[in-house]
């Protein structure tokens, strides 16, 4: 099912029960502090919603299915509950979901054979640019196609358990591999298109899942994907996860940024 919305209440330090279909890091480890300075924590009002990626001091990219009526972002966070020296809070002035994304598929909370969840991408324009520091940095968009077999790293604050919701305070990283799309085509009844990347471990045990939606997938150190959807429970054998393939969207991203300075 879709990696939908995880709500974490910072004021109470509690996590609400998560609906089925969310995304989490499984089989990962605590990221080294400030090792992912482009990682964004996206909030709906005061509740944690999704991950995101800082691609420009004024722009964050995330998944289109991370929809809300109110966006706020935290930058430079490693632990979501601690006061941290590099942490920066920003409001979002505008959101730009990809025009070809089909939001009604997400709202239905169902998955049907042949459903096409392509174009799961959204740009967020910050009301004030981020301050670039040792703990907050932008990451470049890809300029070349990723290679099958590449070593990839995904990160997020999603659940570390595939069925029992257990959400970490600290940012988690997981090392996985980029697979051919044919592996995901065999795994899913939904469409797997050339606008998507297939990544994970066929033996299972390592995956992104609830709460990781919208976060980064770096392959050979290059930002190549945005966490989108996958199996439930996550990290199942022969069921890698799906990521939005950024190289297919660089022209659209640059156009939106240029037209909305």
From Swiss-Prot:
Glycans are attached at residue 108. It is an enzyme of class 3 (hydrolase). It catalyses: Preferential cleavage of Arg-|-Xaa bonds in small molecule substrates. Highly selective action to release kallidin (lysyl-bradykinin) from kininogen involves hydrolysis of Met-|-Xaa or Leu-|-Xaa. Disulfide bonds join 31-173, 50-66, 152-219, 184-198, 209-234. Residues 25-258 form the Peptidase S1 domain. Its EC number is 3.4.21.35. Keywords: Disulfide bond, Glycoprotein, Hydrolase, Protease, Serine protease, Signal, Zymogen. It holds the Pfam family Trypsin. Glandular kallikreins cleave Met-Lys and Arg-Ser bonds in kininogen to release Lys-bradykinin. Predominant kallikrein protein in the kidney. It comes from Rattus norvegicus (Rat). Residues 1-18 form the signal peptide. Kidney and submandibular gland. Not expressed in liver, pancreas, spleen, parotid, testis, cortex, prostate, ovary and pituitary. One of its GO terms (cellular component) is cornified envelope. PANTHER family: KALLIKREIN-1, KALLIKREIN-RELATED. GO terms for biological process: positive regulation of antibacterial peptide production; regulation of systemic arterial blood pressure; zymogen activation. Belongs to the peptidase S1 family. Kallikrein subfamily. InterPro entries: Peptidase_S1_PA, Peptidase_S1_PA_chymotrypsin, Peptidase_S1A, Trypsin_dom, TRYPSIN_HIS, TRYPSIN_SER. SUPFAM superfamilies: Trypsin-like serine proteases (SSF50494). The active site is at residues 65, 120, 213. This is Glandular kallikrein-7, submandibular/renal. Residues 19-24 form a propeptide. One of its GO terms (molecular function) is serine-type endopeptidase activity.
